[in-house]
């Protein structure tokens, strides 16, 4: 059986790791042992931060919606409650975008939410009202 020399394979693996470590500080970019550890850690950070990014954006959308809704005399929680009771299903990303770029349409949603809240307060029930969009 012929002897298998692994030089080519090792070189390719090392090259792949060092390419991923390009731009790192100090020895982390050119010493294979430290570069491998740094690249592994960077992948862990990237995985974690893809999840954190989603949280951060949702928080940003909520802050924007809250700021826009307060101009109409509502709080974020009451606004979302009103939308749910009115049967309007719009996600927070779209609401945030509407608040910034289409204030008239956003105002219409706020008035629909207010109307639903007032109707249910007058009726004294927590059920959906007749004007709900299905």
UniProtKB/Swiss-Prot annotation:
Keyword field: Ribonucleoprotein, Ribosomal protein, RNA-binding, rRNA-binding
Pfam families reported for this sequence: Ribosomal_L20
Domain of life: Bacteria
Alphabetical list of CDD domains matching this protein: Ribosomal_L20 (cd07026)
GO BP terms, alphabetized: ribosomal large subunit assembly; translation
Function, as annotated: Binds directly to 23S ribosomal RNA and is necessary for the in vitro assembly process of the 50S ribosomal subunit. It is not involved in the protein synthesizing functions of that subunit.
Protein name: Large ribosomal subunit protein bL20
Organism: Rhizobium johnstonii (strain DSM 114642 / LMG 32736 / 3841) (Rhizobium leguminosarum bv. viciae)
Gene name linked to the record: rplT
